A protein has these predicted regions:
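Active-site glycine-centered loops adjacent to acidic/histidine catalytic or metal-binding residues
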Residues: 65, 132, 169
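Charged, alpha-helix-enriched surfaces in structured cytosolic catalytic cores
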Residues: 20, 77, 81, 111, ...
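Conserved G1/Walker A P-loop phosphate-binding module
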Residues: 1-73, 188, 193-204
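Residue-level signal for inorganic ion chemistry
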Residues: 51, 132, 179
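Switch II of P-loop NTPase G domains
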Residues: 3-6, 44-50, 61, 67-97, ...
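Conserved protein kinase catalytic core
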Residues: 33-34, 71-74, 110, 138-139, ...
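Conserved C-terminal guanine-recognition region of P-loop GTPase G domains, centered on the G4
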Residues: 58, 85-162
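Canonical P-loop GTPase G-domain recognition
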Residues: 1, 136-196
């Protein structure tokens, strides 16, 4: 697995297709425009990027910006290496507490999105889906997109796998409170009952 910081605090990964808006979501959530570089060229983020969430001068969690998947301009070898590293991280990282999957509401869930949901489902990691660019839809279209996504996910809610969905717009700040609440629910139990010693060395 790629070199990562010690697994001493809960981590939440932000995943999705290239240019889905992962970096922008992290920037909006943290209220820092340039915290995670938001590129207009898909495939720009090619490494795992870790961002600490600080409370009272202490890190209580990390947000992890994963490289976008499925971008056609990436060389096949690069895509293979990415798949291997991502798979290793998702399968082995002990501090993972949840996955935020960002999906363009105008396109809906695609094949690679379903693959990721199944992938993290093997570890029973909760998935929270952001239907991004919701500001592009009127209210009726937003409701229909939300319902369609919920219905499409029913077959994946097996063995109690937690999958939740919300509307999201970084531009209009749609869904900010809902997202913050969801992430807090994931982090707080993990903070109160940590599975990993604070002094665990970095994984490489």
């Amino acid at each position: 697995m790629v070199e990562c910081p010690g697994a001493s605090v809960p981590e939440i990964v932000f995943a999705g297709r290239s240019n889905a808006g992962k970096s922008t979501a992290i920037n909006t959530l943290c209220k820092q425009r340039q915290l995670a570089y938001a590129s207009k060229m898909p495939g720009r983020t090619q490494l795992l990027n870790f961002f600490h969430v600080i409370e009272q001068a202490e890190p209580i969690a990390r947000l992890v910006d994963l490289p976008g998947y499925g971008f056609a301009q990436l060389a096949q070898t690069s895509q293979s290496v990415w798949d291997k590293e991502l798979g290793s991280y998702l399968a082995e990282r002990p501090s993972l507490v949840g996955t935020v999957l960002i999906v363009d509401c105008r396109r809906g869930l695609l094949e690679l999105d379903y693959a990721l949901i199944k992938w993290v489902g093997h570890r029973q990691l909760p998935v929270h889906i952001l239907l991004s660019k919701a500001d592009k839809f009127n209210r009726q279209e937003q409701v229909l997109a939300l319902r369609a996504t919920q219905k499409a996910l029913d077959p994946y809610r097996v063995n109690g796998h937690e999958i939740t969905v919300q509307l999201w717009s970084a531009l209009k700040k749609i869904g900010m409170v809902e997202l913050e609440t969801q992430l807090s629910n994931w982090v707080r139990p993990a903070v109160s009952t940590p599975d990993t010693p604070e002094n665990e060395p970095p994984t490489s």
